[in-house]
Amino acid sequence: MIYLDNAATTMIKPEAVARAMTDAMRRAASPGRGGHVPAMTAAEIVYRCRENASELFNVPEPERIVFTMNATHALNIAIRSLAHKGTRVLVSGYEHNSVTRPLAQLGADIAVASSAPFDRNGILKAFRDKIPAAELVVCTHVSNVFGFILPVYEIADMCRRAGVPFILDASQSAGVLEVDYQALGAAFIAMPGHKALFGPQGTGILICGVEGEPLLSGGSGSDSIPQLMPEYLPDRM
């Protein structure tokens, strides 16, 4: 079989990934929830993964790396942290439903930076014209349908100059193109683990440039006495 559906999920995973997953299932359990050997082993794996991700995406504070169930989970956290009913949100014309549906469900006022298809200069002009009226910008790095690469570093710079928070959907670019947290200055960067990072299904990353609001509440494995989630990252999320 010749597999061409890598934009949805990469397959077959590298042998090293399969070995690491098998090893973790046999030796590790309950990271951050105990002092026994399996818990400490699991915690070490999580910390090492967080440090590796922070190095790959140029995040100087590893605690800003929050692990999620997938990119949809990460995007929902990011969007619901910064948008609400009536928020003026600017998006590209290439967004995934994981961006547009949460915004629609919230009742955000969505505007599209539209241009001729695959017109880099036209897209930049559309964003330049519309960012001043926006309260939030959400943009994909690469279209999952067309493979078109959007000029997100330039868009992020426009947002920074205008004081508008920027969320990047790096679902199709993480592991393929450079995703530089410090250069982007994004409020949030979301990505899955199961695409070009060659991880398993059910994994994702949210890089938190600002404080977010937890989408789910429950056991954090630390600071368990308060009724609310801890205030510090990554446990807060």
Regions picked out by a protein language model, each given a short descriptive name:
Residues 1-237:
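Pyridoxal 5′-phosphate
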